Amino acid sequence: RYDFSLVLKENKGTCSSKHAYLKDFADKNDIKNVKFFIGIFKMNEKNTPKIFPILSQNKIEYIPEAHCYLKINGKVVDVTSENSLFEKIENDILEEIEIKPNQVVDFKVEYHQNFLRNWLKNSNQTKSFSEIWNIREECIQKLSE
């Protein structure tokens, strides 16, 4: 995650590394209308159908998930993959903040984990943070298959 140029060298990357690379490129070229965001959205069976069995098995309606994207002239641009459709999650965004490219390394994880801890405190969820984080990891693994 530290070397954003790996996106080009390896021809792959995450939502974090791809958008951080593009924002960094924009900054270095004095392109001011590009903003970089982390959005926390309700990852659920509707917007992420592949994880339904995991959510169902654990009796969870959704898990707050972090996703990175750009806004260019205020319009969301998501280049995570050719199938990325921000429209799938835009109505499920719980919170978003603008960040700098170097914040995707440590800050993104801390921000996401803090959000989850607060969500657990303020929801009827009976699972622990560790349980939720592990279920989330299982969902992410399922999505990479």
Language model features: what each stretch is:
Residues 39-145:
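His-Asp-centered catalytic microenvironments across diverse enzyme cores
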Residues 3, 24-30, 78, 92, ...:
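Acidic-enriched, low-complexity/disordered segments with a strong bias for Aspartate over Glutamate
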Residues 11-38, 70:
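Cysteine-centered nucleophilic/redox motifs
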Residues 1-14:
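Secondary-structure boundary elements
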